[in-house]
A protein has these predicted regions:
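Polyanion/phosphate-binding surface patch
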Residues: 1-34
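Hydrophobic mid-domain F-helix/FG-region of cytochrome P450s
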Residues: 104-108, 123-132
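Short, surface-exposed recognition loops or helix-turn segments adjacent to catalytic cores
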Residues: 114-124, 141-142, 224-229
Length: 392
């Protein structure tokens, strides 16, 4: 989405384009900026800008809205939130292992069972193009290959032919259309197909390393699947490519993706800075959780202790202990008005607050507080320090 230049943007407009209503020619003269498309490129700019202040490897996560000129429909938005996590300044494959673990941990915590983390490697795709003698058509080849699950083998063949890839070349690579089995079986199939490609064999070794490490560590709920047609972000990914699919039966596109980039900072003048990053499509994840009924029916209260309000003097006494509770890391609040006790207790019940504290005239005299456990109904008269220990 383009943004109009500040001030009198028409002052520098292409007069001819304006007169002829030629929007394509007019746009560059009135709009030099656009809404944020993703979080990866701004991150690369930040790293270059602050390269002398950062400690590498540098890790960060970022959650912000981004904008795309998409036609709005289920799972596609013009404005949506992305959550990115990146590590830059290391080419270690242990980072890939950790990012797969991160995906698995997050989706396990959300209760999403059966999430599939698909993985491929840019070097494997380069190897395919190399063995069929079409390295100069790598992008055309992989863009067509990436559509295999949508348009089928015949559709992919037709598109490759239309891009100038010969029928003989396609025939050489046809075995990848039938590549089936588990991760190890697919790897063995790749070895045969890419036996003459140095880049391809390097990609296979990287995939094997990641698979072996994760096999030894184990995943909680997700599964790792080798998808040799996966080609997202090919313009800047140089190694591992990742994409996360929603559980089977949920009609949704990818809910996450990422990969290894060896020179993304190069566009801003910092060469050879390797990194890897992944993204969570938050809005799509929300839709999946909603469809599967994984949102809780009631929101668990953050407040652990509610102090009833009996008047100004009592509230002042209560706030002294509330401050101590908060200092101890325990969420506490004072009911704002001296309403009827029944109303205040009902408020605590509806919000699921586990403890209620009564601080009336008697408690003030004794320098005590009455703590009520809302689940058991048990009441204890305690000093402020004893109360903190009891609810902490």
């Amino acid at each position: 989405f383009k943004i109009l230049n500040s001030g009198d943007f028409l002052n520098k407009a292409d007069a001819g384009a304006l007169e002829n209503k030629d929007s394509l020619k007019l746009t560059p003269s009135i709009s030099e900026k656009a809404l944020r498309y993703d979080l990866t490129v701004p991150f690369a700019r930040y790293v270059v800008q602050h390269q002398n202040e950062l400690e590498f490897p540098f890790k960060r996560y970022q959650i912000q809205p981004v904008w795309r000129a998409d036609r709005p429909q289920k799972g596609r938005f013009r404005e949506f939130f992305q959550c990115d996590a990146d590590v830059v300044g290391s080419n270690s494959l242990w980072q890939e292992v950790e990012f797969v673990q991160l995906y698995d941990a997050v989706f396990a915590a959300l209760g999403l069972q059966g999430v599939k983390i698909k993985i491929n490697n840019r070097k494997v795709l380069s190897g395919f193009a190399e063995v069929i003698g079409e390295s100069d058509k790598l992008i055309d080849f992989t863009v067509a290959l990436d559509k295999l699950d949508k348009i089928g083998e015949e559709g992919v063949t037709t598109e490759m032919l239309s891009k100038g890839i010969s029928a003989e070349a396609i025939e050489k690579i046809r075995p990848i259309f039938q590549l089936k089995g588990n991760f190890s079986e697919k790897i063995e199939g790749l070895r045969e197909i890419l036996s003459s490609s140095g880049a391809g064999k390097e990609g296979i070794e990287e995939l094997e390393f990641i698979s072996r490490a994760l096999g030894a560590i184990g995943l909680e709920t997700a599964s790792l699947d080798l998808d040799v047609t996966l080609a997202r972000g090919l313009n800047y990914y140089t190694g591992a490519i990742l994409e996360v699919s929603a559980p089977e039966g949920v009609a949704m596109g990818s809910i996450g993706g990422g990969g290894r980039y060896d020179d993304l900072t190069g566009i801003f003048g910092l060469k050879g800075m390797s990194g890897i990053g992944i993204s969570f499509g938050l809005d799509r994840i929300y839709l999946v959780l909603e469809e599967l009924g994984l949102f809780p029916e009631t929101v668990t209260a953050n407040t652990r202790v509610l102090f009833l309000n009996f008047g100004d003097e009592e509230s002042l006494y209560a706030l002294q202990t509330i401050r101590k509770l908060r200092t101890a890391g325990i969420s506490a609040e004072l009911y704002p008005d001296p309403a009827k006790m029944k109303k205040q207790m009902n408020y605590a019940n509806r919000r699921g607050i586990p403890y209620v504290v009564l601080a009336g005239a008697e408690e003030i005299r004794e320098e005590k507080l009455t703590l009520k456990n809302m689940a058991s109904g048990e009441q204890l008269k305690l000093s402020p320090d004893q109360l903190i220990a009891e609810v902490g």
